Amino acid sequence: MAAATLSFGPEREAEPAKEARVVGSELVDTYTVYVIQVTDGNHEWTIKHRYSDFHDLHEKLVAERKIDKSLLPPKKIIGKNSRSLVEKRERDLEVYLQTLLTTFPDVAPRVLAHFLHFHLYEVNGVTAALAEELFEKGEQLLGAGEVFAIRPLQLYAITEQLQQGKPTCASGDAKTDLGHILDFTCRLKYLKVSGTEGPFGTSNIKEQLLPFDLSIFKSLHQVEISHCDAKHIRGLVTSKPTLATMSVRFSATSMKEVLAPEASEFDEWEPEGTATLGGPVTAIIPTWQALTTLDLSHNSICEIDESVKLIPKIEYLDLSHNGLRVVDNLQHLYNLVHLDLSYNKLSSLEGVHTKLGNVKTLNLAGNFLESLSGLHKLYSLVNVDLRDNRIEQLDEVKSIGSLPCLERLTLLNNPLSIIPDYRTKVLSQFGERASEICLDDVATTEKELDTVEVLKAIQKAKDVKSKLSNTEKKAGEDFRLPPAPCIRPGGSPPAAPASASLPQPILSNQGIMFVQEEALASSLSSTDSLPPEDHRPIARACSDSLESIPAGQVASDDLRDVPGAVGGVSPDHAEPEVQVVPGSGQIIFLPFTCIGYTATNQDFIQRLSTLIRQAIERQLPAWIEAANQREEAHGEQGEEEEEEEEEEDVAENRYFEMGPPDAEEEEGSGQGEEDEEDEDEEAEEERLALEWALGADEDFLLEHIRILKVLWCFLIHVQGSIRQFAACLVLTDFGIAVFEIPHQESRGSSQHILSSLRFVFCFPHGDLTEFGFLMPELCLVLKVRHSENTLFIISDAANLHEFHADLRSCFAPQHMAMLCSPILYGSHTTLQEFLRQLLTFYKVAGGSQERSQGCFPVYLVYSDKRMVQTPAGDYSGNIEWASCTLCSAVRRSCCAPSEAVKSAAIPYWLLLTSQHLNVIKADFNPMPNRGTHNCRNRNSFKLSRVPLSTVLLDPTRSCTQPRGAFADGHVLELLVGYRFVTAIFVLPHEKFHFLRVYNQLRASLQDLKTVVISKNPSAKPRNQPAKSRASAEQRLQETPADAPAPAAVPPTASAPAPAEALAPDLAPVQAPGEDRGLTSAEAPAAAEAPAAAEAPAAAEAPAAAEAPAAAEAPAAAEAPAPAEAPAAAEAPAAAEAPAAAEAPAAAEAPASAEAPAPNQAPAPARGPAPARGPAPAGGPAPAEALAQAEVPAQYPSERLIQSTSEENQIPSHLPVCPSLQHIARLRGRAIIDLFHNSIAEVENEELRHLLWSSVVFYQTPGLEVTACVLLSSKAVYFILHDGLRRYFSEPLQDFWHQKNTDYNNSPFHVSQCFVLKLSDLQSVNVGLFDQYFRLTGSSPTQVVTCLTRDSYLTHCFLQHLMLVLSSLERTPSPEPVDKDFYSEFGDKNTGKMENYELIHSSRVKFTYPSEEEVGDLTYIVAQKMADPAKNPALSILLYIQAFQVVTPHLGRGRGPLRPKTLLLTSAEIFLLDEDYIHYPLPEFAKEPPQRDRYRLDDGRRVRDLDRVLMGYYPYPQALTLVFDDTQGHDLMGSVTLDHFGEMPGGPGRVGQGREVQWQVFVPSAESREKLISLLARQWEALCGRELPVELTG
C-alpha cells in the first residue's frame, strides 16, 4: 500500500482531500440503513447510519457551526422505505456529506469526526482521541506504573502528525493537543504494541505494514511488540540506555532487524567498546547497555547472527518457536543463564559447550535431537528440558549423567521414555546423585532409589564379570539356581561372594497394594541366614491336607456351578462343556515371593536364557518340520478340493496377510491364486528365517536371545481340556516361553521357587494368530496356531498392559490388523467401559452410572449342606453353619463331592462398585476361529449382583483355626447374603487390596447393612469390625520377619516374644471370658491373631477416655444445681443459655435443668410447661443420667456394664424378631462383646449407651419399627427389626439370599443395622415433653426419629450424646457462624422465647420445642371444635405419645397398636395422628411434606368421661376410657358422626348403648400416672366428685 511506503523525510506531498460516498442501503426491520464509504488518501473504511443519525448530526452542526438548515434532505412520513425515495435520498445524503467535508477541509468538527469514524481510522481523529484520553487518565497511568497498550495505527498517526509540521492543537480544543501524548510518552516506562493480522476493523488498513517511530519514548524499561513488521519500526534503538526487557513476537525474520537495524546501512560494523584489529570498519554501533531479558520467540528467525554482540549483558534469551538449525554466536553472551531453544529445527549439539559457558537452564524441547553428546561439558547446567525429541538410546543419558549441578531433567515423549522401567534406568545413569534428580517433573521416590541401587549393583557385577570373560567364557553356561541354603559351585567368580542367593528383586508399584515395602523387601531378600525349619509353612495341617489330594479325584459334574449361583441371570445360555482338570486337584495361586524378579535381574535372566536355549534346541526340528508340512500342504492343494477346505487352510496360514478375512474371501478366484502364491513365498521365507535364526549354534543362541519382558501370572491353558497353573511368561525377541511354578513348590522361598521352574512350551511370534483382552485390564488372551492352544493370562493391570505393549512392538504395524481379534478388546478399552457394556447387556438399571472400584480374580468355595445345630454348640460336623475355615471348605470341595459341596473350579472375578459386589464368570472354552465371532458376545460372561450391604467379612471364623502363609495372603471368608463363601485370591496382594477397597465402600454406605449376631456369646466369634480385621491383616503383612513370606506368618508363630508381651494387654479382655467358664480348649482362642488384633482397642481405650472425662466433669457436677431453681427463673436461664453454649458445662446444663419434676404438674394458669424447657424429667433423673454419662476411667467400666444391663430391657409392647430377642437376653459384659464383635465399624470405638425404642425413617414415614439403639464414641447404631428389610433392600431372589430350611437352628442371627456417624450428624430435634427426638444428617437417608415415648429415656440419651459429641473435634462450618446484631439481640426485649436452639461445641444443633409450637397445636385443636367462641381458652395440660388398641377380630388375641398423640386440655381430651419425621423441615427439603404435622382423629369432653378401667389385658396397665356419647355435644361434631357405625379395622371403639370406649396404652409408667392424676383432677373440678377408676383382670 502507498500508505505503507511513505517515508519519514521532511518533504511530503500535499494531504489528499477526504471523500464520503453513499454506496448502498439496507433495510433493517422498519427502517433503512445507508452504507457510507469514507476515503482518506489510500485508506478506506465503511460505516452505516440511518436517516435519524443524519438528522441528529445536522441539528448539532446547525447549533454549533451555523450551517444551512436546508442542506439536509427533509423527512418523509409516508413511503419512507420505498425504493425510489431511498435511491433519491442516497444521492442527497452523499451531496450533504461531501458538502460538509468541503466546508471543514482541515479539521472536522467533533460530532462530524465521530459520525464518520475519524477517531478510529483518520490520522487527526486518532491522535485527537488518544490525546483526550491521556489528558484525562495519563497521570493516573504513570503513577500506577501499569503497562500501556497502544496500537500500531495510533503510533502511525502520531508519526504522521509530527512529520506534517502542523500546529499541535489544530482543532482548537485544548484536550486534543498533541502535547499531551508527547508528555506522556516521554515518561512512560512500560509499553505494549499489539497489532492485528489482516485488515483493521471495517477498513483496508493493515496495521502490521504501517511504519511508526518509537523515538518519542524516552524512558522505556520494558517493551512488548507483537504482530508488527520489524522492518518498519524506527526509533527503538533510542531506548538502548534504559531498556531492560524486550519482547518481539510474530514480527521479525532476523535478529539484526531488532537489535541492529542501523547495521543494514554498513558493510562492516563493530559493537561499541571492542578493540578493532585494523580491518575496514565503517561503523561503531552502541550496545544495549541495560538489556538483560530478550524474548524473540514465535518469529521466523533462521540463524543466531552476530547482532548478539550488541547485548552483552543478556541473562535470559528466548528463541523458541523459530527455525534455528545451528547454535552459533552465543559465545559472546558471557552473562547468559537461561536459554530457550525449544521447538526449532536443531538436530545436533556438537560443540555447544564452547558457546554456552555459564548456562543453568537450557530448554531444547521439540527439536530433532538424537544425541546428547554435546552437553557433556556444560558443567553449570541445572535444568534441562529435552521433551519431544528423538532420543532413543539409554546410553545418550550418560552424556549428562556426570554433570555435577544437574537437578531437573525432562525426557517425556522421546522414544526412550517407552522403555520398561524407564525412570529407574535413567536415574541409574546419575550414580550417587540419583536422589537429587527430578525426572519429568516427578520427584524421585525411595522405591526408585532402592531399584537404582540394585541396578548399580548388577552393573558392577557385570563389569567385574566382563573383566574375567577372557579366561572364563563358558562360566555362565553352567550356572544353575541352587535351592537355599546351598552354596554356589566353585566355578563361580570369586568377585561376587554375595551371589549365593538371588539379588533382592525389584518390586513394582502394582504388586504392592496394602503391604509395607520394607516387609516385602525383607521377605524377598536372601534367606541363607534362616534355619531350615523356618522355611516350612506355618499351617502344616492345612498345607498337608491340600497337597495330599490326588489328581482327578473331583468329578467334573461336582465341579460345575450351582444353578443360579453366578449365571442365574441367563439360565438359558448353553455352553459347550469342557473337561476341567484342576492342577493336581489343588487350589492354584501365584506366590508373591517371586513377582519381584523382572527382566532387570541379570542372574535370573541368565537362568531363563539357558532354559529357553535348551528348549529351542529340542523344539527346533519340530518347528522346521511344521513349516515344511505347511509348504507341502500348499503344494498338494488342487482344484478338486472343496471350497470350505480351501478357506480353512487359507485362514490358518494368513497371519502375514492384510485386511479382514471376510473381505478377502469375497474377492475373485484370480485374486485368490495370487494370494496363494504370496503365501507360498512367505511360508518359504519363514522357514528359511527360522532355520537361520534358530540354528544349532549354541553360542549364537545364547548371545542373541534377548528377553524383553517377564510376566508372573496365573495361566489357564485350554487345549481340548482346561489346565490351570501359576506361570512365568517370558517374552523374547523371537517368541514366548511358558514356565510353570510347580504347585508343591509354591509355598517355598523365592530361591526354591525360581530354581524349580519347569519349562512347559514355547512358540515363535509367527505362531501367534490372535491376541487381545478377554476382560480389559484383567485377562489377556493369546491364541496359538497349529496346536490350537489358547492361553488366558491373569495378572495385575499394569503388568498386563506392559506385556501387551511389548508384544505389539514385536510385530510390524501392517501385521497387527490380522492379530487383533474382533472378539477381544484392545488396550484402549478400559475396565469401566467393559462394565458399562456388561450391565447394559443384562439390562441393569442405572448400570451406566456405576464405577468400578476394583476387580479381583478368585476361586469361590461355598457349601450347600443343610444340617441342624448340634447339641452344646458343637458345629464341627455342620458344613453350612460351621466356622467355614479354608482347610475344611477346600477339603470338602475336593474330597467330599457326595456331600453336595460345590466348588468353583475356575476363577471368577469379584468386581466392586460403590453399591454392589458383582460376581463375573467368564467363558474359558476354546476360542472360536476367526470369522465366526458372531456367536460370542457379552453373554460369554455370566453376572450375579449382590448388594454390598449384605456382604460381610468372615463373620463366624473361629480364632482357634491355625493360620499360615497361604491363608493369610490369599484366603478371605465372606458371608454373602445367607451363604458362606471362601474366596481364594489367585494373585498376590489382591486380598489386601480387596480388603482396603471393601472397607472404604462399606464404611461409605448409607443404607441398611447386614450384621451377624452370634447366638453363643461365650464362643466369642471372629466378627470384629471391618477396619479392625483389615488392620490385623495389615499388621500381619507389616511384621518385619525373616521368613520368606511375612504376610503369612502370624505374630504368635513368627515371634514368640511379642506374643508374650501382648499377654498383659489381653488380660482385661480375657478375664470376663474366664469368669464365664472358658474351657482349656477355648483358652488359646483369645491368644490367636484375631484377639491380638483387638488388643490395641482395649489397651488404648483408657488413655483416650481420660481427656473427655476430665473436660466434662464440671458439666456433670454443675448441671443438677439449676434443677432446684424455681419455675419462674427457668425462662431467663433458658434464654441466656445460647450465649454460653460454647462451654460444655453451659451447653449441657439447660437441657437438664429446666424441666419441672413429675409431681410439679403445671396448672392451666401457668401456661404450657413444655415451652419452658426441653427436658421435663424426674427430680433425680438428671443427676442419675449425668452420673451414668460420665466417661469411665477404664473401658469398659463396671458402671457401664451395669447400666447397659439395666437398660437392656425391651418394652413389652414393641414387636420383636429372634435377633432382637437374643440381644435383649444379654447381660453384663456380653453386651459389650456383642457390640465390638458384631456391630462396631471402627477399631477403637467404645459403647456409651443402650436404648430400646421404635424408630421411623425419613424414607418410610408410615412405618414404625423396633430398634436397639447403641450410642458409641463414633456413631449411633440402630439394630432393626427384620420387617424393615423388604422396604430398603433390593429384591432377594437369587442363590445368595435363599434361606435354608434350618435357618432358625443356625448359630447366628442375620440382622439389619443402620449406622449414623456422629461426624455426619447435623442437628437433633427434641419433641414436646421429651416424648421423642429426631437425629438429622445431611441427606434423607440419614434422618431417623426415635419414639421413646418416655421423657426419662430421651433425656438420658441426649445427655450421653452431648457428652460423646464434646469429645469430638469438628471442623468449622463453612457457613458463617456469627449472626448480625439484630438477629442475635433484637428479640430479647419481647419477653417471649423463640425456638430454643443450642449450638453444641461440636457444631451439632439441638433444637427444643417452644411456646410457638404449643400455640400452633392449641390453635389446630381449637379450630376443630364445633363452636370455638363458646369455649374458654384452651390450655394444654398434658402431651404424651401413646397407642390406641384396635379391637381384635374374634378368635384372635391382642389387637394391634396404632401410634397416637394424646392431648389433655382443661376441658377436652384428644387423639391425634402426628408426623414425627418431617417436622421441622430438614435443610435439604425442597418442598413441604404432603402430610400435615397434626391430624385430629377424635376428641371428647372430659365431663363426658364416665369411668376409667385399668387392667393387664390385652397390654399391661392399659387404660380404657369410657365416655357417655351424649346427643348434641358440641365437640368434634363433624368428625364423630359415625360413632355407632361398624368400622372394620377402625379405631378401638366399642359402642354399647350410648357409651364410647377408648382403649389407650401408655408405655411410660410416669406418663400413665400423670395422665390419670390430671384427668381425675380436671374431672373432679368439672363434675364435683371423684373419677371412678376400676381395676379389671
Swiss-Prot record:
Modified residues (Phosphoserine): 543, 545, 548, 1373
Miscellaneous notes: 'Nischarin' means 'slowness of motion' in classic Sanskrit.
Stored PROSITE patterns: LRR, PX
Region Interaction with ITGA5, annotated ranges: 709-807
Name of the protein in question: Nischarin
GO cellular component entries: cytosol; early endosome; intercellular bridge; microtubule cytoskeleton; nucleoplasm; plasma membrane; recycling endosome
Start and end residues of each stretch annotated as Necessary for homooligomerization and targeting to endosomes: 121-695
Chain intervals for the UniProt region annotation (Interaction with PAK1): 246-869
Sequence repeat windows: 1081-1086, 1087-1092, 1093-1098, 1099-1104, 1105-1110, 1111-1116, 1123-1128, 1129-1134, 1135-1140, 1141-1146
